[in-house]
Structures are given as C-alpha cells and as structure tokens.
Amino acid sequence: MAETNQDMNSCGCAGRHASIRVVLTGGPGAGKTAVLEVIRRAMCPHVHVLPESAGIVFGGGFPRGTSAELRRPAQRAIFHVQRELEATGLAGDHALVVCDRGTVDGLAYWPGADDMFASVGSSLGEELARYHAVIHLRTPASGQGYNHANPLRVETAAEAAAIDAKIAMAWARHPRRFEVAATVDFLSKAAHALALVRDQLPACCRSPASRS
C-alpha cells in the first residue's frame, strides 16, 4: 500500500497534545498560500491548517467594495467566520493550529477611527491573547515578484504594501511576533517561515518518526 503524506510525515507521538494557535499573516501577495501548502505537506498530522476566512466570505459572494458602508460589515463577517474556524481547530488532537490570518488582521482593513473590536464585543488585548505566536510574511514590492494572479486579489503592489504596513502595526503589541522579510528568492523566505512554524511545535512533533 502506498504511503500517504500523513504516513510519511508521522511524528510517532503517543500522547495527546495541548493545542496552541499560530497566525501566519502578511499583506496581499506575501506568499501565505504557498507557505501554508508546504506546511500541510511537510509537517506531521498534529499540525492543522485553517483556511482563510476572508476567502470564504468573499469567495462565497459577500458584497465587497471600497466604501465604509461595505467594508465594516465585511470585516465583521470575516471576524466571526475566523472565530468559528478557530473553534473547529479544537476538534482532534492538534498540537498546532495554523491560522491563515487572525482576527487582529481586520484592523488593517477597517475604515475610520472607531473601534472595530468594540463593534464585535471584544478588545485588541483579548484578540492578541488568543494566539501563541504571529509570523508575518512581508509583502514584496513590485520588482520583487508581487503576484497579481489571485482572482480575489484586487490590490496594486503599492496598495498591498500599505496594507502590509497596517498589518504590522495591528500586531505590533504581540509578544511573540516574528517577521519574514520579502526577498526575490521565495524559497529562502518559505524556508525561514517553515522554521519559525516548526519552532512553535512541541519537540515530539518537530521531525518525522524514524522508519526502518
């Protein structure tokens, strides 16, 4: 019988794990999708990757536009979908739940000076505390390979860079925030991000079990 990815990457852990959440974030075109796919394929079955809530919301047809009247309800919808996605991560024996963005990312897209978290009955401190660590992939400039291919991506390279800066500000108070710099060599960027994710794992899950 052929081995599956999970068989090949099995860590051989026998005990149950205490689950933690780690956010992989970054502006549009930062490379999150590619890095998350590597995580799914390369890490043990106790690493669980959640889908992006914004992709679910907008991919499902939620109205999208530039006015505050459209952006506020969209960000509230994304917040609630993100919270419920994270709740699903409690099912199963997951040592690490990797979130494709977190609830705090919404601050980078929220219009105006009013408090986004007050509008959903929460606070910045409460949301930051939900996550063990945050890994921020910085968005490349146009000359560094900014990718326009994603049909849900509507930002120019300049707009993406501005959003990326706002994301950095939103997460700045998190005590375990790591940055992965933009680089022309995406493989080195991905390797750096993967190493940071692996560092958050318990020792028993950091490498596949040896097989004869």
Feature map (PLM): residue ranges:
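Extreme N-terminal, non-catalytic leader segments
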Residues: 1-21
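Hydrophobic anchor at the beta1->P-loop junction of P-loop NTPases
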Residues: 24
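P-loop (Walker A) phosphate-binding loop of NTP-binding proteins
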Residues: 27
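Conserved lysine of the Walker
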Residues: 32
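Conserved substrate/cofactor phosphate-moiety recognition/catalytic segment
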Residues: 37-81
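A glycine- and Lys/Arg-enriched "phosphate-lid" helix/loop adjacent to the NTP-binding pocket
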Residues: 109, 114-172, 181-193, 201, ...
